[in-house]
Amino acid sequence: MFNFANFYQLIAQDTRLQPWLNVLPQQLTDWQNAEHGDFDRWLRALNKIPQGVPDQVDLKNSVTIGSSTPFHTGELKKLESLLKTFHPWRKGPYTVHDIHIDTEWRSDWKWDRVLPHISPLKNRSVLDVGCGNGYHMWRMLGEGARLTVGIDPSHLFLVQFEAIRKLMGDDQRAHLLPLGIEQLPKLEAYDTVFSMGVLYHRRSPLDHLIQLKDQLVSGGELVLETLVIEGDENAVLVPVDRYAQMRNVYFFPSARALKRWLEQVGFEDVRIVDENVTTIGEQRTTDWMTHNSLPDYLDPNDPSKTVEGHPAPRRAILVATKP
């Protein structure tokens, strides 16, 4: 069982987050009571991971955990085996006591594209919606964020996050909650909100943008990253079935259409700061994620298209301000 008591204590002392206590404990109790087939096995492995007291931590340039007292070879092999229990590792990479967790995604590449365009995170309270296993939350702390809260309903992502946090020395500046954005009350509590790789999974994209706006303080910044298509402000792709083998996908606007959507729901100073075609160097199969990946989702005869005939994955980053 997970104990969220530390997070409850933290938000009880934060006047902007206090109202969350009206609903959050019951939501997390309901989550704990829901069964998941692999969860007990993952928890047993998590409990065997040693509590870290690292004296070499880099969150600025990577997510690297080390110690001046190195692990013995046998200890490293045992730790690597435990971490591989949490396969597949999709977001990263991580370096943990010389173990390189080579994840499916080079999430550090995305961070390098995002970082030059956002307001400095120093002393900011940050919400990361659809945070995966929390890789970017650690990078946000590396940029000086005061607090990072991530939400993602995946059991596996939570266990992966807690494994890294345990090895990190139980850092209490980052917290991952197994919730979806629709479960959050209107908090208006965060200085910066990130939504990266989520919008195309939402049946109602405008409602998602409003939900993100509802979490920001006045003057707060939204960082939105999602799959897009090329085209003008009226261009939107709505796949009939799958897109790059993904089923639960709905709307792929052009970056210009997405800018209009953000303005329509009340954001100001909306900027398209990056567009980038995803390469097979950024998303691929590895020893830590052995399932199919981007190379399997593209047309083998025309990599500019998915296997379904849609335009190949193209991602945009937009930054906007809540008035």
Swiss-Prot record:
One term of GO molecular function: transferase activity, transferring alkyl or aryl (other than methyl) groups
Binding site for carboxy-S-adenosyl-L-methionine: K91, W105, K110, G130, D152, P153, S154, I181, E182, M196, Y200, R315
UniProt keyword list: Transferase, tRNA processing
Catalytic activity, reaction form: carboxy-S-adenosyl-L-methionine + 5-hydroxyuridine(34) in tRNA = 5-carboxymethoxyuridine(34) in tRNA + S-adenosyl-L-homocysteine + H(+)
EC number of this enzyme: 2.5.1.-
Any Pfam family the entry gives: Methyltransf_9
CDD domains from the UniProt entry: AdoMet_MTases
Domain of life: Bacteria
Single biological process term from Gene Ontology: tRNA wobble uridine modification
PANTHER family linked: TRANS-ACONITATE 2-METHYLTRANSFERASE-RELATED
Family assignment from sequence similarity: Belongs to the class I-like SAM-binding methyltransferase superfamily. CmoB family.
Function: Catalyzes carboxymethyl transfer from carboxy-S-adenosyl-L-methionine (Cx-SAM) to 5-hydroxyuridine (ho5U) to form 5-carboxymethoxyuridine (cmo5U) at position 34 in tRNAs.
Assembly mode: Homotetramer.
Name of the protein in question: tRNA U34 carboxymethyltransferase
Organism expressing this protein natively: Vibrio atlanticus (strain LGP32) (Vibrio splendidus (strain Mel32))
Gene: cmoB
